[in-house]
Amino acid sequence: MAKHNDFGRHSEIMAQNYLRSLGYTILETNWRSGHKEIDIIAKDENIIVFVEVKSRTNDIFAKPEDAVNFKKIKNIVRAANTYLISHNIESDSRFDIITLLLMPSGEYKIEHIKDAFIAPLGI
C-alpha cells in the first residue's frame, strides 16, 4: 500500500477512536454505494452522523476541510440517502468533517466540524 494510503487509513482509525471517546457508536466504516464512499457512519445519541475524514501533513496551501468541495458533498449526500433508505432509518442525521493535521512534533491536531454542511436541494 502506498505511504499516503497508510497515512489516510491511520487518520481514519484515529477519527474513529476520537468519536468513540466522545461516546459515539461507530456503525460503519468505508461504507460504499457504487463509487461513492462514506468514511465513517456513527450514531451520536439518536442522530446518524455521516463523517468525512480529511488529513494532511501540512496546511501550507489549504486546510484539510477545503478538499470537501461541492462534488464531494453531492456524493456524500447521495450515499447517505442510499444508506438511510437501505437500512430503513428515519432518524435525524447530520454531516460532519473531522480533520487531522500532522504537526511538526509528530502529534496530530484533530478538529471536529459538526454540521459541516447541509444536503443541497435537489439531491
Regions found by a protein language model. Name each.
Residues 57-78, 82:
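Mg2+/Mn2+-dependent nuclease catalytic core
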Residues 19, 38-60, 76:
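Conserved catalytic cores of phosphodiester-cleaving nucleases, focusing on short active-site segments
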Residues 31-33, 55, 99:
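Short, glycine/acidic-enriched loop or turn micro-motifs at the edges of active sites
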Residues 86-123:
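Domain-level recognition of nuclease-like catalytic cores that cleave nucleotide substrates
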Residues 35, 48-50, 92, 110:
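Structural motif
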Residues 33-36, 106:
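Short acidic/glycine-enriched loop/turn segments that link adjacent beta-strands
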Residues 1-29:
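Acidic-basic catalytic patches of nuclease active cores, encompassing PD-(D/E)XK
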